[in-house]
UniProtKB/Swiss-Prot annotation:
Membrane-protein topology: Multi-pass membrane protein
Protein name per UniProt: Transmembrane protein 78
Regions crossing the membrane: 49-68, 78-100
Protein species of origin: Homo sapiens (Human)
Domain of life (superkingdom): Eukaryota
Keywords: Membrane, Transmembrane, Transmembrane helix
Any one annotated GO CC term: membrane
């Protein structure tokens, strides 16, 4: 399936949990757990994923992702001494990143009370003239 992350300008093709950037042909794949709503040339897909029981309830995508990226400025500054690590650490700080992810990405997972992650995404067929509808 094609995911149009409009704010980043990236088109991603996902098949069985593996996502790679794509720019050519359109292929739509979805499984029985997906709910697809079609309107003219856009699709709204809602998918549920079960979380493993061993994960703590407070662990969410934005927390783990920002924790991972908080080590990025240090590792880059070790390999690139001339790189402006202050600017990079400011832009990738954990306090800035979760709010950026919530506002900037079209693909936004969130932790539900029943232990499922709901992913709302907007699919836009390449070459269509109408603007894509936004996921709510």
């Amino acid at each position: 399936m094609w995911l149009d992350t409009r704010n980043l300008g990236i088109v991603i093709s996902c098949w069985k949990g593996v996502c790679v950037p794509q720019t050519t042909t359109l292929e739509m794949f979805y499984n029985d757990n997906d709910r697809v709503e079609e309107s003219s040339n856009s699709y709204q897909i809602r998918r549920e994923f079960l979380l493993p029981a061993c994960l703590p309830a407070f662990l969410s995508f934005s927390t783990s992702f920002s924790f991972f990226l908080s080590f990025l400025p240090l590792s880059l500054s070790l390999f690139l001494p001339f790189f402006p690590s202050f600017f990079l650490s400011l832009s990738l700080s954990p306090s800035f990143l979760p709010s950026f992810l919530r506002q900037g990405l079209a693909l936004s997972p969130r932790l539900e009370c029943d232990g499922a992650i709901m992913i709302h995404c907007s699919l836009n067929i390449p070459g269509s003239s109408d603007p894509p509808t936004s996921a709510s």
